[in-house]
Amino acid sequence: MRFNPQDWKEKSHTNFEGAWHDGPSVITPPGEDKKYPRLRYTRAQPHPIFATINRLREIYLSMGFDECENPVIVEESDIYRQFGPEAMAVLDRVFYIGGLPRPNVGISRKQLDEINDILQSHRSPLVHGHEIPAGDSGNKEPFRPMSRETEEQLRETLHAYKKSEIDGDELTHELAKVLGVDDGIVVHILDSVFPEFRSLVPESSRSTLRSHMTSGWFMTLGSLWERTPLPIKLFSVDRCFRREQAEGPTRLMTYHSASCVVAREDVTIEDGKAVSEALLSAFGYEDFRFQPDDKRSKYYMPDSQTEVYAKHPVHGWVEVATFGMYSPSALGEYGIGVPVMNLGLGVERLAMIAYNANDVRQLSYPQFFPRLAGDREIACAVHLREEPVTVEGKALALAIARVAAAHATEQGPCSFTVWEGTLYGRNVNVIIEETEANAKLCGPACANEIFVHEGNILGVPDNEKWKDVRIKGIPTGISYLSAVSALAAANIEHAARCGTGTQVQVKMAKHPGDINLKIEEYAMRTITDTKKKVDVRGPVFLAVRSEIAE
């Protein structure tokens, strides 16, 4: 809370020791949600794939490679130019781009009558092609069918759509303007009167989505190599699309390729080895091994396609990249007259190693594979249902817990004044009491504390039986007594605002709500999915009463 520094300065000069001991009075007592482990200073987590991409970009730039964006849409003819006779096998794994054709929509008299019927059923306030007679307005105006002018405008609009002068996402709005009705009515008309829109079948083009970055490099280098000083050193980290038979733990239909090219008159396969080491050593790889790749893609020179194996301190030898020298036959198709070394690696592959993942689907799309919450996360998900909101109310909750703990074993009937103060401008007295003879002020479970152990939420006492839970479990920082004290203080606060006293009594606890606990849904989902439990049962038997003082 705010405090007057001048007052504390004078207080310190007058009685330093007293001022020092009174220092905690300026601290606002934290509610349970403002206590550790629920109080956390966290940072947002980047996606592992994009974190890997950012590292790759930084490393490439530090190596002197300029960043480039290659075309994503590649014509089928380019695949033939790059792969030659091998193109047919490659095209089996690409996605062709298709779209819906524009229907040739004609409007017969029957269809115009159907449109009029729909317009009449909705009673459009607009009158097509007519003046509204004096004295008539709104729904008083009798419906009139579309005028010839409106019918012709309707035909022209549909014809413009057929000729692609109007985009598909604009058609509904344009028809609504012609008919003078709401867009929703036009949607009804298109669905009911023009069934040809619903029977459209996609048609494929000869354009494909890039299946590997090489497709783009040939086009880029063909445009640049005679207009840019050599050497040309470019990199690109971007998506590729491959029509796999099925996605699995190591394969996705869309993935990220981190690829680079070096074009100069004396570039050789040795450049591929040097680039591999410079790039991958930044990821912690310590040694490298190069061996011929059996796949022998036709856009590479014979015997130049090379697999890169790198030794990781944790994972050992792993395959991480491929490089090779572009074939002059493929380069010649694009008019490129200089040797080119190309290196590529799969970002997802690199990220799987870096993040110890065994399923690329789970690494790329974690939202579809929600992980189970750990004990600490579950502990953070345990909150109080009700808490006091004022500084006085929070101090009251602490006072209730303190007095109850101090007199927990007192035999009833007994009562103790907990707090006397002001709430919402009213003088309030708070008493903790036990009215029954031979009953203790607090039940034995009041001293229980909430721990999370091996996925279970448990309320346990401090004894030998539960020693393992208290040592190995994660404490929530909440006891039965602190939770019930907060409940009592919140209710007393509310009653004082209304000008009345109240009584709060908790007896046998069976469920979390009985002791003022709530558990976040995600934590409960983990507990139920793993067949764990929430056990906060116990005899609490605590009664707190407030009264408004005169």
UniProtKB/Swiss-Prot annotation:
Family of this protein: Belongs to the class-II aminoacyl-tRNA synthetase family. O-phosphoseryl-tRNA(Cys) synthetase subfamily.
Reported function: Catalyzes the attachment of O-phosphoserine (Sep) to tRNA(Cys).
Residues reported in the UniProt entry to bind substrate: 212-214, 257-259, 299-300, 342
Keyword annotations from UniProtKB, A to Z: Aminoacyl-tRNA synthetase, ATP-binding, Ligase, Nucleotide-binding, Protein biosynthesis
EC number in record: 6.1.1.27
Chemical reaction(s) catalysed: tRNA(Cys) + O-phospho-L-serine + ATP = O-phospho-L-seryl-tRNA(Cys) + AMP + diphosphate
Provenance organism: Methanoregula boonei (strain DSM 21154 / JCM 14090 / 6A8)
Pfam families per record: SepRS_C, tRNA-synt_2d
GO biological process: translation; tRNA aminoacylation
Highest taxon listed in the record's lineage: Archaea
First-tier enzyme category under EC: ligase
Subunit structure and binding partners: Homotetramer. Interacts with SepCysS.
A GO MF term: tRNA binding
Residues covered by region (Disordered): 1-32
Protein name (record): O-phosphoserine--tRNA(Cys) ligase
InterPro entries: aa-tRNA-synth_II, aa-tRNA-synth_II/BPL/LPL, O-Pseryl-tRNA(Cys)_ligase, Phenylalanyl-tRNA_Synthase, SepRS_C
